[in-house]
Swiss-Prot record:
It comes from African swine fever virus (isolate Tick/Malawi/Lil 20-1/1983). Residues 300-323 have a biased composition (Polar residues). It comes from the Viruses. This is Uncharacterized protein B475L. Residues 299-329 are annotated as: Disordered.
Length: 486
């Protein structure tokens, strides 16, 4: 080892001693003041110091000034003879060849020193915080002091020597390179180097593109395979639906098939069969609707027409649609009265009685068995109560049988005609009175009765009683019906 190399190694060892002292002692003391774990806090301190020197210019200048003072004390050189610029030149010249160190300006040397120190500090901090070194620095410091400091000094010296060799090689390559004579050649050389870098990037991108295309082709093959499998399964499902098309449960499945994308059904037969199924369904729906309409019309015709056996007399009752504000009064007749009247008429027709004979017989009967006679009797004798009337009706004998009515109709004499005419005059008088009483009653309109059934129409027979006639069919379609008769 010559004298020059020994001088360089002494400078590198001085640099290593200063920064090892900072990492081993100064940052460890700062970590002890925190309440967190010492290991974690020591790591935070090391990282903070490295980032501060790199990023904060003031902290870097402060660190460099303290290092300058330390260097003067260690080398025992007076600060007057070794100023700050000479200190920077001494450190940087130890990394560069002599032929180049004299030609470099002081500003460039400052920038070179900054790069060297920042790189050195970051690498030394990374080495200290490894799992191999960190436990020995934080724990059992007295026992492991010599061992740890020796390893740190060896790492520092080897790193600085390696860095010196790299800088030497850079300057040697620069010396071998022939400098361009003109600016045009210099720009050409710069652009050619930039072009080479672009070509290298293009090669990398093309290789990546090839790899991506290969992956895309494999994925496309997988997709086509799965798509064909999916189409096959859908076709099988469609065939199964066609086999069970006669059952009603197949209808939701056909709807499910129709919701699937059309690209899976390239078969034209499926499209034709699907359209035919839709036509059949629409035809069935139309037929059902026509049947319903025919049933409704038939029911309306049945309810609107009366039986042919029962002639309907002309009624004085006018049934119109009621206004929205008018309350509908209750009817004077009920379903029971209507059924009783129908049963009576059927019984008379079965036994051979005509309506004319029944009317004449009702005119010739004794007035004591009529409702009008009971009313006149009650008017003449108001002291007789309803109980006596009920007893009188219960005690009366069934003297008028159907056989007696037949014999009476056959054997009746012409002298009864005068009494019949008198009774007709009485009936005409009563009809006039009833017409005057019913003129003030409102005509009720009910829209619910027009389409379903016609109301009961009451007329007076020749004997002065109400005779019930109806346009009802034999089927009763409603409950109580509310009407007003004028």
């Amino acid at each position: 080892m010559d004298q020059e190399e020994s001088h360089v190694i002494s400078i590198f060892e001085t640099v290593g001693a200063y920064f090892i002292n900072i990492f081993y002692n100064f940052l460890y003391k700062n970590a002890l003041y925190k309440k967190h774990s010492i290991v974690m806090e020591y790591q935070y301190q090391v990282k903070g110091y490295i980032l501060g020197v790199k990023q904060n210019k003031k902290l870097y200048e402060k660190m460099l000034d303290s290092f300058y003072k330390y260097f003067c004390n260690i080398t025992q050189i007076n600060s007057k003879t070794l100023n700050f610029s000479n200190f920077v030149s001494t450190i940087v010249d130890s990394f560069l060849p002599k032929e180049y160190s004299q030609s470099i300006s002081l500003e460039k040397k400052d920038s070179i020193l900054e790069l060297l120190l920042c790189d050195y500090i970051s690498n030394l901090g990374t080495f200290i915080t490894t799992e191999k070194m960190l436990p020995f620095i934080v724990k059992n410091r007295k026992e492991n002091y010599h061992k740890v400091t020796k390893e740190m000094q060896d790492y520092s010296l080897t790193f600085l020597l390696k860095k010196r060799m790299e800088l030497y090689n850079k300057f040697l390559r620069k010396q071998a390179y022939v400098e361009p004579e003109t600016e045009l050649e210099e720009t050409y050389a710069r652009l050619s180097s930039y072009n080479r870098s672009l070509l290298y990037q293009i090669e990398e991108l093309t290789s990546e593109k090839k790899s991506f295309l290969e992956e895309l082709s494999t994925l496309r093959k997988k997709y086509e395979k799965r798509q064909s499998e999916y189409r096959r399964l859908v076709q099988l499902l469609y065939q199964q639906i066609q086999r069970s098309s006669s059952s009603k449960t197949s209808y939701p499945l056909t709807k499910f098939i129709e919701t699937l994308p059309s690209e899976h059904f390239s078969n034209e037969e499926y499209q034709k069969e699907a359209s035919a199924d839709q036509k059949v369904i629409l035809r069935e729906q139309e037929e059902t609707e026509l049947l319903r309409e025919q049933e409704l019309l038939a029911s309306q015709e049945v309810t609107s027409k009366s039986p042919n056996n029962y002639p309907v007399p002309q009624s004085r009752t006018i049934v119109n649609k009621p206004s929205d504000n008018y309350p509908v009064p209750r009817s004077r007749s009920t379903k029971i009265d209507f059924d009783n009247s129908l049963q009576k008429q059927e019984l008379h027709a079965k036994n051979g009685f005509s309506e004319k004979a029944i009317v004449e017989f009702n005119q010739d009967k004794q007035p004591m068995f009529k409702e009008e006679a009971i009313v006149e009797f009650n008017q003449d004798k108001p002291e007789i109560k309803e109980e006596t009337i009920v007893e009188f009706n219960q005690n009366k004998q069934p003297m008028f049988k159907e056989e007696a009515i037949l014999e009476f109709n056959q054997d009746k004499q012409p002298e009864f005609k005068e009494t019949i005419l008198d009774n007709k005059e009485i009936l005409d008088n009563k009809e006039d009175i009833l017409e005057e009483e019913n003129q003030d009653e409102p005509i009720v309109q009910n829209p619910f009765l027009e389409n379903f059934w016609k109301p009961e129409q009451k007329t007076f027979n020749q004997s002065g009683l109400f005779e019930e006639s109806s346009d009802f069919s034999n089927d009763w379609s409603g409950g109580d019906v509310t009407l007003n008769f004028s």
